[in-house]
């Protein structure tokens, strides 16, 4: 076992971390293990996890049932190519998904990661329109402050101004961007919010293959919660103009918003849905792009006679076995009560921050709590303050947010929010 200082030194010299400089002086912590909602550092400190490892670890860490699923599958096969083969884990996972997905979504294409699932969905939309003879439909529409991943076409539908990919703006495919829906979740609807989309489709609808949205909750683009009615109105317009509707549920899927899928808040089914992150309970990378039988058959009736995509690790049996067990574990748990409990606690415990002059807004939905600051936080000084308080929270930009594992207990959640408040108080008031 490598000692902490040697590990950190080698890491600093050779390993590149996400969204970081190779010469970064940002704080870096060596993790020894993780159990439940607790992360244990190599120096012995223990942190309550407020991030679910970026939305993924619904059941916490080191869960005995997920460990057993992994061990059982490892004894059979860890991987086999999916071209010309199928296997129990893929079929079992697909059976579970078909039972819980919004109505009509029954053709499942397994992919590697969330970003790749978005790429796959966009390729599906282009191939579908091409197969219908609508070869001029090469563009996509989306709303501002969205985030859909870090691969090429996924970046093209992230906000080009406020997003993380503005450096590539002049190289990426040019898409159509609409204003962020200006009606927050649970506020009364006004049709003015959908008018920009209606205007765009009236003028440019015959150029657009699909509209892609993060339903209800915008994730890394701003952690904004908007009215589900927008989705209902958007779907009607898409149908009117022959445009596919893609829902990116990579962050919101599997209960995070209080519904199994955020689309359920609107009571509708998209034409294509992307899932990932929590699909395997945070154990391995796996995603899926799911569509309808009609769309799949149309794609396969086109020029290529098939869908033109095939990842090496598609439907990896180890990942599929863990994902199937994660879904069973979720459905057998009182997950809805847990989400309601977490949402209620987050609203109550974070509310004092709304009175601070450095805070713009505090909001919570499901197991998501957001403190939006008036200016960007200093990660270099704020993250160590969280660690000193025994909590793991990783803010970005103006957003300090938590999305804890669903299994977090009341006392752990209180320690998480108290640590968050204390760290912010130290950062901004002392």
Swiss-Prot record:
Keywords: Aminotransferase, Biotin biosynthesis, Cytoplasm, Pyridoxal phosphate, S-adenosyl-L-methionine, Transferase. Pyridoxal 5'-phosphate binds at residues 114-115, 248, 311-312. The record marks 19 as: Participates in the substrate recognition with KAPA and in a stacking interaction with the adenine ring of SAM. It comes from Haemophilus influenzae (strain ATCC 51907 / DSM 11121 / KW20 / Rd). The gene is bioA. GO terms for biological process: biotin biosynthetic process. GO terms for molecular function: adenosylmethionine-8-amino-7-oxononanoate transaminase activity; pyridoxal phosphate binding. This is Adenosylmethionine-8-amino-7-oxononanoate aminotransferase. Disulfide bonds: none annotated. Its cofactor is pyridoxal 5'-phosphate. Pathway: Cofactor biosynthesis; biotin biosynthesis; 7,8-diaminononanoate from 8-amino-7-oxononanoate (SAM route): step 1/1. It catalyses: (8S)-8-amino-7-oxononanoate + S-adenosyl-L-methionine = S-adenosyl-4-methylsulfanyl-2-oxobutanoate + (7R,8S)-7,8-diammoniononanoate. It comes from the Bacteria. Its main location: cytoplasm. Homodimer.
